[in-house]
């Protein structure tokens, strides 16, 4: 099993060679998360390793954005951040949050199960702000990357 086919890898590798200041890589499933039993790149260790090597070798700033978890969280591995956000329309019920506590060594801050969305702010060439917000626009988590 694979996540990306040969042509998709070639395309992605070519994008990492372009002259850009920042790469925002969006995935339908989580890239950094390791400790849950749902869909994630970690279920495909060879592919995840290949992607993380591509990111590291590019020597470019990269922000990861993912979803499909019905929760929100920020993950960090070395200097690589992932903003996972969903959802405004299908949050997990509150009772499930109370009995199911997910942990992950790469988790920064808390997991949020209520309605949420993510924001990536590019302040200038030296500051990126990742935010998780609730349905009222209140900040749940915030990370400033310099």
Language model feature labels by segment:
Residues 1-146:
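Metal-dependent phosphoester/phosphodiester hydrolase catalytic core
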